């Protein structure tokens, strides 16, 4: 189980990403579309002044059950370990053990 502080940090990042998503996309689009060097530089400065944690790259998907940050399946929001446990119990329909 992940520490509560890590889970809270990730939820805070998720909120910041959503809050600044539109503003960040507008600035990036302005940088790409503009030919004026001064406008590009001003837009880059505004983009740099946004909170660091509002960058979507810093957001990490975590397992909803245990909080593990690696090997999380987006479809289920579960890590590989919890997904396997849920499949074995039968809580996720359609899953079965593979054999070859």
Curated annotation (Swiss-Prot):
One of its GO terms (biological process) is translation. One of its GO terms (cellular component) is cytoplasm. InterPro entries: Ribosomal_uS14, Ribosomal_uS14_bac/plastid, Ribosomal_uS14_CS. Its cofactor is Zn(2+). Zn(2+) binds at residues 63, 66, 79, 82. Keywords: Metal-binding, Ribonucleoprotein, Ribosomal protein, RNA-binding, rRNA-binding, Zinc. Gene3D superfamilies: 1.10.287.1480. It holds the Pfam family Ribosomal_S14. Binds 1 zinc ion per subunit. GO terms for molecular function: metal ion binding; rRNA binding; structural constituent of ribosome. Belongs to the universal ribosomal protein uS14 family. HAMAP family: Ribosomal_uS14_1 (MF_00537). NCBIfam families: PRK06911.1, PRK08881.1. Part of the 30S ribosomal subunit. Contacts proteins S3 and S10. Binds 16S rRNA, required for the assembly of 30S particles and may also be responsible for determining the conformation of the 16S rRNA at the A site. This is Small ribosomal subunit protein uS14. It comes from Legionella pneumophila (strain Lens). The lineage of its organism: Bacteria, Pseudomonadati, Pseudomonadota, Gammaproteobacteria, Legionellales.
